[in-house]
Amino acid sequence: MTDAPIISPLDQARILSEALPHMQRYDEETIVIKYGGHAMGAEDDAKAFARDIVLLEQTAVNPVVVHGGGPQIATMLKRLGIKSEFAAGLRITDGATIEIVEMVLAGSINKQLVGYINEAGGKAVGLCGKDGNMVTASKATRTMVDPDSRIEEVVDLGFVGEPEKVDLTLLNQLIGHELIPVLAPLATSSSGQTFNVNADTFAGAVAGALKAKRLLLLTDVPGVLDQTKKLIPELSIKDARKLIADGTISGGMIPKVETCIYALEQGVEGVVILDGKVPHAVLLELFTNQGTGTLIHK
């Protein structure tokens, strides 16, 4: 490991001076941050992320964290000998799997992240969409084309849900008391059934309901790439739809961008897809002139 570069006091002052107008821009604004399971990395990385979240709160930003946990769920399922299958990019979640998903997301990752934020001096509260009926969902459906018959078939994803309604009562109370909500992407149906919700989709629904200033989707790629694999720094909704249509945006990036478009249409001012493995990615995006990742806007 190499030593960090030495920054002179003057350079430190310049960095703070550059950050000031950005801090003023986000003063008292709500920022929803989706922290993906792949972006979590090692414990030191998670603790650094937690410190950055506390810094946001100290600068009068209202951060709301939604975390994923795909790799951690996969590890636990393998340890328990439970096979896991995917369809249309979503984990098929049967009765045994949903219990493990809830245990890992709400019982392990959520509380660990809450602990890191509190250790850094923040006041985080760990919840999932089931708490206070915050997020109500319905069963998700996807269609896939059978490779042999070429017939489109409906895929049963089990207990995978799509958000239908977000009740802001609990979130607004937490934000109003300067507490940091940390949300696991689990929801409940009107009949009380627990659903596993894609973390990007969950974050988009929450951000849209809150009319957040920004939604940040931290993932394991730099952002949206063009056909030469170079980062596209900024896109309008119209541009994004064109890139989906011509195949530039493909695979797992399509649902992420669709989540961005949904959030923007619900009133979020801007959405950024960025690499969560980059140190201090959230601060780089919000508090520097250059930013990082791909900004999608109306």
Swiss-Prot record:
- Give UniProt keywords alphabetically: Amino-acid biosynthesis, Arginine biosynthesis, ATP-binding, Cytoplasm, Kinase, Nucleotide-binding, Transferase
Give the positions of the site Transition state stabilizer: 34, 256
Instruction: Write out the annotated subcellular location.
Output: Cytoplasm
Name of protein = Acetylglutamate kinase
- Give the protein's function: Catalyzes the ATP-dependent phosphorylation of N-acetyl-L-glutamate.
- Which family does the UniProt entry place this protein in? Belongs to the acetylglutamate kinase family. ArgB subfamily.
Q: Per the record, what are the reactions this protein catalyses?
A: N-acetyl-L-glutamate + ATP = N-acetyl-L-glutamyl 5-phosphate + ADP
Q: Name one GO molecular function term.
A: ATP binding
